[in-house]
Swiss-Prot record:
Gene Ontology biological-process entries: proton motive force-driven ATP synthesis; proton motive force-driven plasma membrane ATP synthesis
Gene it is expressed from: atpG
Function: Produces ATP from ADP in the presence of a proton gradient across the membrane. The gamma chain is believed to be important in regulating ATPase activity and the flow of protons through the CF(0) complex.
PANTHER family: ATP SYNTHASE GAMMA CHAIN, ATP SYNTHASE SUBUNIT GAMMA, MITOCHONDRIAL
UniProt KW keywords: ATP synthesis, Cell membrane, CF(1), Hydrogen ion transport, Ion transport, Membrane, Transport
Protein location: Cell membrane
GO MF, one annotated term: ATP binding
CDD domains for the chain: F1-ATPase_gamma
Family from the record: Belongs to the ATPase gamma chain family.
Membrane topology: Peripheral membrane protein
Record-given protein name: ATP synthase gamma chain
A Pfam family annotated for this UniProt entry: ATP-synt
Organism, as annotated: Streptomyces coelicolor (strain ATCC BAA-471 / A3(2) / M145)
Gene3D superfamilies linked: 3.40.1380.10, ATP synthase, gamma subunit, helix hairpin domain (1.10.287.80)
Length: 305
């Protein structure tokens, strides 16, 4: 019985130490998600207005450009998947990967060859384990992405969209990331970045019936779109990176809170078992003492007779 009590005490100490770690990780994630939320709020208006500017230019000109012109028969698409470098975030990475795989299957059914680009070690590990081809990968900055990181990710994608498909280019650019809705809700979504669907953009921004201004372009609308293309792709990827970072921190906070709560419940259960074992040990000792005293009394009574 004493050995069993020692086992319970050892497990209580172990779970208590784990609880301290998960509580600390929960608090760290909570502080990081607040910072990430602020960055998302700061970057979203810029991305929205830049998209609106591209829409205005595309609507006001008849120029054929990768930003606004769809291929007659698209044959190749690039998919950018955003995951995290670290785990301990519940279903955060698996949901994004699942959404990317569903998008890839749909594009392939429609006759497109898919080139996959991945941000985050978790997504890369998933694809490498299954021996799936990855054109390019990026890692090391998913917790706190910067605009420079977004530019690094965007560079090969912009190069691919500007190339002809016969030279290894793509007709479409899609992105899969986790949208931050609230502290309790994060949703894996896929979005087509290029070519830009002018009607969808107007509907999303609530400007469907808005009359966009007419512009005179110097030197030309094509040159303006050439200048806007990298800015547009970089800003959208940067916003998606920030959304994914905020979602990852929120998922980590939720997972660590659940782990902390479970550790507390396990400690309570082990404490009850330890108390029961201690009580049983005390009861057994009392029974042995009483039994010994009774036997001694009987022996003394026999000797007196």
């Amino acid at each position: 019985m004493g050995a069993q009590l020692r086992v319970y005490k050892r497990r209580i100490r172990s779970v208590t130490a784990t609880k301290k770690i998960t509580k600390a990780m929960e608090m760290i994630a909570a502080s990081r998600v607040v910072k990430a939320q602020r960055k998302v709020a700061a970057s979203t208006p810029y991305a929205r207005e830049l998209t609106r500017a591209v829409t205005a230019v595309g609507t006001g000109s008849n120029t054929k450009h990768p930003l606004t012109t769809e291929a007659d028969s698209p044959s190749r698409a690039a998919v950018l998947l955003l995951t995290s470098d670290r785990g301990l975030a519940g279903a955060f990475n698996s949901n994004s990967i699942k959404a990317a795989e569903q998008l890839t299957e749909r594009l392939e059914r429609e006759g497109r060859q898919v080139d996959t680009y991945i941000v985050g070690r978790r997504g890369l590990a998933h694809y490498n384990f299954r021996e799936r081809k990855v054109v390019e990968s990026f890692a090391g900055f998913t917790d706190e992405p910067t605009y420079a990181d977004a530019k690094k990710v965007a560079a090969p994608l912009i190069e691919a969209i500007e190339k002809d498909t016969a030279e290894g280019g793509v007709d479409e650019l899609h992105i899969v990331y986790t949208e931050f809705v609230s502290m309790m809700t994060q949703t894996a979504v896929d979005s087509r970045l290029l070519p830009l669907s002018l009607d969808e953009v107007a509907e999303e921004s609530g400007a469907k019936d808005e009359i966009l201004p007419l512009y005179d372009f110097e030197p030309s609308a094509e040159d303006v779109l050439d200048a806007l293309l990298p800015r547009y792709v970089e800003s959208r990827i940067y916003n998606a990176l920030l959304q994914s970072a905020a979602s990852k921190h929120a998922a980590t906070r939720r997972a660590m809170k659940s782990a902390t709560d479970n550790a507390g419940e396990l400690i309570n259960t082990l404490s009850r078992l330890a108390n029961a074992a201690r009580q049983a040990e005390i009861t057994q000792e009392i029974s042995e003492i009483v039994g010994g005293a009774s036997a001694l009394a009987d022996a003394n009574a026999g000797s007196d007779n």
